[in-house]
Amino acid sequence: MPDGTGLVEFGKRFPDRFFDVGIAEEHAVTFAAGLALGGMIPVVAIYSSFLQRAVDQMLHDVCMQNLHVIFAIDRAGLVGADGETHQGCFDLSYLSMMPNMKVLAPKNAAELEQMLEYAVACEGPVAIRYPRGCAYQGLTDYGAPVMTGKSEIIAKGKEIAVLGVGSMLSDCEKVCQGLREDGYDPTLVNVRFVKPLDVELLDCLAGDHSLFVTVEENVKSGGYGEHVAAYMEACHSESRVLTASVWDHFVPQGKVESLRTKIGLGVEDIRESIENSEVLKKK
């Protein structure tokens, strides 16, 4: 799907480096594995919902052999007008279970470029997931180098830590603004790496944060929030984790903003969930 993935111009400029395999996702991944074995660095540009068909090939043909294949995952998260079957709300779950796979999510267009450069330079399989539509141009004042398994602190506070995954970070910034207006001093984190988990940052924040809030456009089961919750329960049981994610059902067609509100991922929904949490009520 060269048009949908934005690769029409690339295909015209570099016809010998562009392969349209049609609607054959399984073949695309195994083809990329073969290219990697031949010494090339293939980039598989594909929709999140379509990549689900190639989970077996990703596991056995790419990850098991730890091949250097880059997955550029378009339409990740809520896609709105594309329809119910195109909602990309499962990729963080099925990607995170794969050994050797690194899973990244950029906050804006500039960071997507950084992550692509990182993916080309590193070894092994890398997945970068980003949303449908025009690239977000905000939060440009923050651009620390991309380092394996390292998140980025946007604002340092105390008591509440809000951890936003990829495209949700801009809304997380609005959530934090609302919390500050209500007298709180939240920390805002750009997750960057869903896998490997930045446990060093979690350990550091656990010292002066009692509530960790994860925000992602992915189903809760197997998502970033569950991985954070499992780690915190094992290593910092005094801290609590609130996960803001997609409900356990299929999301219908609709505009992204209205869908977020409908499933409890709107800015005000998240802020209210934080302020109504048992952790803050006890203080």
Model-derived features: where do they sit?
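Thiamine diphosphate
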Residues: 1-124, 134, ...
